[in-house]
């Protein structure tokens, strides 16, 4: 039997798909790639935008049309957040949410045996436990992603994720550390702690993210630890100083911004101001002292009520911080969120224009930030081999580089001197 997966959305979704692939493989299935024939087609959906829902439905419709005898599965955040709507999508033989993922295999086997269509979407509940879905292999044999938390307790005006993912649920430290030991033994040198709300780790279990990072750093063989997205309001001075003391922690912080304008942040129902965000950045820089540190972020433009002045203020804030990378998103009006009904919606054409302008600002800031690192040294984890001795990789600061490394191999960490940015990567040379 062959099964084909299609994944939309975040790194957590990719991690969960990897776990499902592992589960199906262990039970005799072969993983088919896109475009190949299969007996089962599974879409792990993302519901951050209405467009994501449409992409999931479109993919399954096409697979059902091309493979009328195959079993089709709609799982993930879309059916979890909008169960009644998803249940009416008849091209899916199995519709299930993002809880009890291991039951997907059992239900698929029932359908292969002739069972009628199955809809199995259980709502998230307070007090439910983290679902263990370990992954043993990743696309590249260099960086591993470990899911340590699920759920979000926040209520941002534009976001449907709390509805899709439920309340905060933390994975047990013992389970995380056991997986880390397995990954180290398999040759992985860098791990990324991923989550839906990473700084919320431990809120439900009496521990915290800093303690987890400190324990992860003690695992032999793991040389670099990287953090997923962080909310600035949850980073206290003590939290920051303890993180800065962990040598294995990569000094690259993805601090969720969403807007550099305080008025817009308030409408978004974010719980910090632009000034408070900037203060956290300065606290992190102060904690690292003379050691270099980098910042990446996400920013939304065209949120309801955002004036031209608000937008310019947000762009100026990007320059003020000096981000290494900014992921810019035009606001997507998501049904099921408070912001969907907000007045003063921005016209789509204006949102796209603001997005183009902000991307240009972000790219200029990126060039200036990378220019400041030219001539400095850093360590690079060699990843994809190109032609001959050329490798791509990332520094501890998450600077993408290309370097000639004769005699080296993928997964090796080497020290390099950073050169010029070519618009895609920084040219580097071995020290």
Model-identified regions with their sequence ranges:
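Charged helix-capping and loop-helix junction motifs
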Residues: 57-59, 173, 206-212, 273, ...
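Radical SAM/AdoMet-radical enzyme domain recognition
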Residues: 185, 210-211, 218-224, 235-297
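Proteins enriched for Cys/Gly/acidic motifs involved in redox and nucleic-acid/cofactor modification
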Residues: 1-200, 238, 249, 253, ...
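Catalytic cores of alpha/beta
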Residues: 83-87, 235-242, 303-320
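Conserved strand-turn element in the central/C-terminal portion of the radical SAM core barrel
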Residues: 155, 159-166, 198, 224-233, ...
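Hydrophobic, well-ordered secondary-structure elements that form the walls
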Residues: 255, 298, 318, 326, ...
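Terminal RNA-binding accessory module
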Residues: 341-431
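Conserved glycine-rich "GG(E/T)P / GGGxP" loop and the immediately following alpha-helix
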Residues: 47-52, 188-215, 219, 231-238, ...
């Amino acid at each position: 039997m062959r099964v084909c997966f299609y994944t939309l959305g975040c790194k957590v979704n990719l991690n969960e798909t990897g776990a499902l692939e592992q589960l199906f493989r262990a039970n005799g299935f072969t993983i088919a790639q896109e475009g190949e024939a299969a007996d089962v087609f599974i879409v792990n959906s993302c519901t951050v935008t209405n467009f994501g829902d449409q992409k999931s439905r479109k993919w399954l419709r096409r697979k059902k049309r091309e493979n009328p005898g195959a079993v089709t599965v709609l799982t993930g955040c879309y059916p979890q957040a909008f169960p009644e709507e998803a249940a009416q999508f008849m091209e899916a033989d199995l519709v299930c949410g993002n809880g009890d993922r291991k039951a997907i295999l059992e239900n698929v086997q029932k359908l292969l045996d002739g069972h009628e269509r199955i809809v199995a979407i259980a709502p998230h509940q307070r007090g439910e436990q983290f679902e263990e879905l370990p992954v043993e292999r990743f696309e590249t044999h260099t960086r591993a992603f470990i899911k340590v938390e699920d759920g979000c307790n926040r209520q941002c005006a534009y976001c449907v994720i709390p509805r899709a993912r439920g309340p905060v649920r933390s994975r047990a430290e013992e389970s995380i550390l056991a997986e880390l030991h397995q990954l180290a033994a398999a040759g992985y040198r860098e791990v990324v702690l991923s989550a839906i709300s990473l700084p919320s780790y431990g809120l439900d279990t009496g521990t915290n993210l800093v303690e987890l990072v400190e324990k992860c750093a003690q695992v032999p063989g793991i040389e670099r630890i990287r953090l997923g997205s962080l909310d600035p309001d949850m980073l206290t001075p003590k939290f920051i100083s303890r993180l800065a003391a962990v040598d294995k922690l990569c000094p690259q912080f993805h601090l969720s911004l969403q807007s550099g304008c305080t008025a817009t942040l308030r409408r978004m129902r974010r719980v910090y101001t632009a000034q408070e965000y900037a203060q956290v950045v300065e606290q992190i820089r102060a904690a690292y002292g003379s050691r270099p540190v980098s910042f990446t972020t996400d920013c939304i433009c065209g949120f309801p009520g955002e004036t031209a002045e608000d937008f310019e203020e947000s762009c100026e804030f990007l320059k003020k911080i000096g981000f290494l990378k900014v992921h810019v998103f035009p606001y997507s009006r998501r049904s099921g969120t408070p912001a969907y009904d907000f007045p003063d919606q921005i016209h789509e054409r204006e949102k796209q224009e603001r997005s183009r302008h902000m991307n240009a600002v972000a790219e200029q800031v990126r060039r200036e930030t990378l220019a400041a690192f030219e001539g400095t040294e850093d360590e690079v984890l060699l990843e994809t081999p190109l032609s001959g001795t050329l490798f791509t990789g990332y520094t501890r600061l998450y600077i993408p580089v290309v370097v000639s490394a004769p005699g080296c191999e993928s997964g090796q960490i080497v020290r390099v001197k950073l050169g010029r940015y070519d618009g895609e990567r920084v040219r580097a040379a071995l020290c």
